[in-house]
Amino acid sequence: MTKEEYLDFCGSIAGATYDQPFNEDFQTTALRHRDTKKWFGLLMLHNDRWIVNLKLKPEEVLFYKDIYKGVTEAYHMNKVHWITLYLDSDVPAEEIEDLTLRSFELTKSKDKKKTKKRKEAL
């Protein structure tokens, strides 16, 4: 999967948005919840390869690291809850999309009142 294909997919997720949050770095892209701005992923260029950090359940982190060479410990994130996935690896596009949706669900705001107030403020 290419960076462009991946960002197109992320842009199609209802309630998702993305931006480049770091000054002077126009390649790193934060994948966010539109209402809370909370990250569900971080897309980066690392050693000339596109990677994305995604949140999973701890048991899923271990599982996916075991079955795919393209899934490793998270780069600059909590290694118990986050993975790094290489977009150009042995991980099929459908699996990348599924893992992205899982991360999106796991990082949703759990406080519905706060989310509602944030939406009203927008």
Report residues per predicted region.
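Charge-dense, helix-prone N-terminal extensions
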Residues: M1-L122
